[in-house]
Amino acid sequence: MPIRVLDELPAVNFLREENVFVMTTSRATGQEIRPLKVIILNLMPKKIETENQFLRLLSNSPLQVDIQLLRIDARESRNTPAEHLNNFYCNFEDICDQNFDGLIVTGAPLGLVEFNDVAYWPQIRQVLEWAKDHVTSTLFVCWAVQAALNILYGIPKQTRTDKLSGVYEHHILHPYALLTRGFDDTFLAPHSRYADFPAALIRDYTDLEILAETEGGDAYLFASKDKRIAFVTGHPEYDAHTLAGEYFRDVEAGLNPDIPYNYFPKNDPQNKPRATWRSHGNLLFTNWLNYYVYQITPYDLRHMNPTLD
């Protein structure tokens, strides 16, 4: 789907350089197609980088996707210019009376922070409650998975002793599930988290179906049977260099991090890493858009919630 974004968004030129199909609003208005409305709650500090990563994955099928960017943290950002946030992001109050086909909630570097200590925890709870009536399907990524499991299922925060960082092998459990359609039997995906997601915990305390696991027994991809919510505990959206950037940042901060697993060639941080998960990430997001959003969302979004005009 060509993604539809504001003409001035920096990601337009960035993605066009990669030959990614981006449709500006001015061009999209000439097509008589209802675009899918997808809103991204971007919780990552480097918002422009995260926009580029997710928009790349949402751009690869034949229908339009109308992207809205959402922020819920009113504090001044140290990593993203205020002008960018003011020009391209909306606040929850701007969209709370609207319906959307899809919602993506990104990860956040909050693995060691207790939920109630997160500055915008009440706002996250508000958005998740709102999504039940206003969004066809929601996809949670990494830390957002942990937050959603707590809010929606009451599962306490599970934290690893050491950070899981690297590119890990996974295997699918349901090869004919729609979300894993076309996946290889085993595939690679990056992880960068303190959050812990034991598959047994998901099975014992939720009605969610686990679709793929890590070789270590962590749940990687799981979803509700009605397709309204889906969870991915890794970072399939990451660029080839993202884990390297995190590693060198932590080295400079004196944190003595482990070298990301299965990432740098010959396990040498001086070697340029390669993205070995790109096809998996594209297929995952295409499947979510097609089977969890497009195939079940109403043509008229007003029908999602009859109380709306």
Curated annotation (Swiss-Prot):
Q: Which SUPFAM superfamilies match?
A: Class I glutamine amidotransferase-like
Q: Where is this site: Important for substrate specificity?
A: 192
Q: Which gene encodes it?
A: metAS
- Catalytic residues, per the record, are 142 (acyl-thioester intermediate), 235 (proton acceptor), 237
Q: What is this protein called?
A: Homoserine O-succinyltransferase
Q: Which PANTHER family match?
A: HOMOSERINE O-SUCCINYLTRANSFERASE
Q: Which cellular component, as a GO term, is one annotated location?
A: cytoplasm
How is the subunit organization of this protein annotated in UniProt? Homodimer.
Q: What does the function comment of this entry state?
A: Transfers a succinyl group from succinyl-CoA to L-homoserine, forming succinyl-L-homoserine.
Which reactions appear under catalytic activity for this entry? L-homoserine + succinyl-CoA = O-succinyl-L-homoserine + CoA
Give the main localization category.
cytoplasm
**Which Gene3D superfamilies does this one have?**
3.40.50.880
Its GO biological process annotations read: L-methionine biosynthetic process from homoserine via O-succinyl-L-homoserine and cystathionine
- Cell compartments where the protein resides: Cytoplasm
Report keywords, A-Z: Acyltransferase, Amino-acid biosynthesis, Cytoplasm, Methionine biosynthesis, Transferase
A single MF term (Gene Ontology):
homoserine O-acetyltransferase activity
**Taxonomic classification, please?**
Bacteria, Pseudomonadati, Pseudomonadota, Gammaproteobacteria, Enterobacterales
InterPro entries on file: Class_I_gatase-like, HST_MetA, MetA_family
Q: Which pathway, metabolic or otherwise, does it act in?
A: Amino-acid biosynthesis; L-methionine biosynthesis via de novo pathway; O-succinyl-L-homoserine from L-homoserine: step 1/1
